[in-house]
Amino acid sequence: MDVQAAHEFGISIAQAARDLGAGIAVFALAGVGMGLGNIFSTLISSVARNPASRPHVFGIGMLGFALTEAVALFALLIAFLILFA
């Protein structure tokens, strides 16, 4: 194997590792989707059982949504940093 072929092979391995790392970083988005579904299904269920608790439960649900969505944005940021940095 000559030097040029070895260099190109090393670059292709690095590209594959970078793409694989970005794909693994995006796996967190599946957990975020399940978490958001769980938050809102529980919110709807609790308001259906006790409509008077809606103002208190809705605020907590929105806080849970924001924190869960922050994890998604962080995972997306890491994936973009892996791909383009």
UniProtKB/Swiss-Prot annotation:
It is a multi-pass membrane protein. GO terms for cellular component: plasma membrane; proton-transporting ATP synthase complex; proton-transporting two-sector ATPase complex, proton-transporting domain. It is found in: Cell inner membrane. InterPro entries: ATP_synth_F0_csu, ATP_synth_F0_csu_DDCD_BS, ATP_synth_F0_csu_sf, ATPase_proteolipid_c-like_dom, F/V-ATP_Csub_sf. Its main location: membrane. Keywords: ATP synthesis, Cell inner membrane, Cell membrane, CF(0), Hydrogen ion transport, Ion transport, Lipid-binding, Membrane, Transmembrane, Transmembrane helix, Transport. It comes from the Bacteria. The chain crosses the membrane at residues 20-40, 65-85. PROSITE patterns: ATPASE_C. GO terms for molecular function: lipid binding; proton-transporting ATP synthase activity, rotational mechanism. The record marks E69 as: Reversibly protonated during proton transport. F(1)F(0) ATP synthase produces ATP from ADP in the presence of a proton or sodium gradient. F-type ATPases consist of two structural domains, F(1) containing the extramembraneous catalytic core and F(0) containing the membrane proton channel, linked together by a central stalk and a peripheral stalk. During catalysis, ATP synthesis in the catalytic domain of F(1) is coupled via a rotary mechanism of the central stalk subunits to proton translocation. Key component of the F(0) channel; it plays a direct role in translocation across the membrane. A homomeric c-ring of between 10-14 subunits forms the central stalk rotor element with the F(1) delta and epsilon subunits. F-type ATPases have 2 components, F(1) - the catalytic core - and F(0) - the membrane proton channel. F(1) has five subunits: alpha(3), beta(3), gamma(1), delta(1), epsilon(1). F(0) has three main subunits: a(1), b(2) and c(10-14). The alpha and beta chains form an alternating ring which encloses part of the gamma chain. F(1) is attached to F(0) by a central stalk formed by the gamma and epsilon chains, while a peripheral stalk is formed by the delta and b chains. Belongs to the ATPase C chain family. This is ATP synthase subunit c. It comes from Gluconobacter oxydans (strain 621H) (Gluconobacter suboxydans).
